[in-house]
Curated annotation (Swiss-Prot):
Coiled coil: none
Organism: Arabidopsis thaliana (Mouse-ear cress)
Name of protein: Uroporphyrinogen-III synthase, chloroplastic
Entry GO terms, CC: chloroplast; peroxisome
Gene: UROS
Record's keyword annotation contains Lyase: yes
Amino acid sequence: MALLLLSHCSILSFQPPLSSSSSFHSSHIQSLSKPVFASPSPIRNSISSSVSSSSSSVSSSNSIPQVVVTRERGKNNQIIKALEKNGISSLELPLIQHARGPDFDRLASVLNDKSFDWIIITSPEAGSVFLEAWKTASSPEVQIGVVGAGTARVFEEAMKSADGLLHVAFTPSKATGKVLASELPEKVGKRSSVLYPASLKAGNDIVEGLSKRGFEVVRLNTYTTVPVQSVDTVLLQQALSAPVLSVASPSAVRAWLHLIQNEEQWSNYVACIGETTASAARRLGLKNVYYPEKPGLEGWVESIMEALGAHADSSNPSSRN
């Protein structure tokens, strides 16, 4: 599939949206993907302080993309390629970027000063930030619990050269913070200690759930997400026309809603990476929301395809007869 890079025309700048709590269900449920109706310092140099949007995988300048992909710049390649394999065109429109959280500089020193029974990681970005601090702290021996397979993949390369010092030892039966907190194994005969490096905007399910079970939990807000500072208006118009918006975090949902706040008629389909994002999308008023039972790339693509199918059915009156 041909790759098209559109020239950047006028730029739309916008301020961060008002914060809103993140974290489902609805009157319409399907078995595979459940539709739910109803300027900080960058963490790494690869994140620029002023981000503009770019497009990918749109076959021609006059084509309407089928899906908008919205993860931060540099992290959309996997989903774009997976969609291409299924013949689905996409438009890359990064809505958020990661920035340092208030506890970013403390993480390495905490790892140096104290050992923990568990390190709990609930997102790929939290994993990447942790690995940087872990290396700075001279790579102490740690046992990792992750929320799902996508997060676990962040540690694969590091574990190959860690000589057993870094070990992913736990994944819950369902990829949510509540289930992780209810299933994390305890140390026999002692109070288990947990280090939880998290996003500033992450909810409290893990801390509350583990604390109720008697775990000692240290939470460090090591990173946060902020909206990109500018969006190309040409790309935004293309995005508004796309049948499906794909989102991977509640922050991306909020950024999109702030960006389109003057587009009262927008009611297209939303494909979320998992239940937490879908719950946030529903609470924020979006309809036609789809998500996979198990978060991850494969399930996300299936949800996108299901959303595209639902859009096609809604656009074809004869299909409903």
